[in-house]
Amino acid sequence: MIGCAAEKELIARLESLELAPFRFHGWLGNRKTQSFGWRYDFDDASFARTDPIPHWLESVRGAAAAFGGLDPGDLVHVLLARYDPGAGIGWHRDRDVFDQVVGISLATPARLRFRQRTEDGGFRRASVDVEPRSGYRLSGSARWDWEHSIAPGDQLRFSITFRTLSDKGRRIAKQTCGTVRQRNG
């Protein structure tokens, strides 16, 4: 999705940020993150506008939108993440204030795992290896019917994940600030 030079520049930018440990109901995760545009707080289940998406992410937002067949302006949330060796993400579905997800993996490969509950109580499983500089899109059934996780890696990895707002997210956004579309000029 992006070239080597762009990846190096993005990693340098990400390493210069003060990313915070991921918080989930009072627990601290092994990965470090920062949200722009919108932020979902897992400690109190709040959803609010936060700092605007930085200008230096505009070209990668454009690439993510082109990859996902989306308008760049619809990608109103971005989550930057650093995964030190041993860090992964447990099984989950993204919160319902978000809809489509376009992620980009940087530095090292990641295994994106999927599972869907079956009628007999078990799981149907699949996985995809996401190479550095490549992307993935979660929409439709993959987004809403399957859970996903990222296996812990043994090397430093970064990710940039863009999201659109769902109908619910847009309703909440309109109630709180009157607009949902963010354009950086």
Give short role names for the model-derived ranges.
Residues 1-185:
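Non-heme Fe(II) oxygenase metal-center motifs and adjacent flexible, charged/small-residue loops
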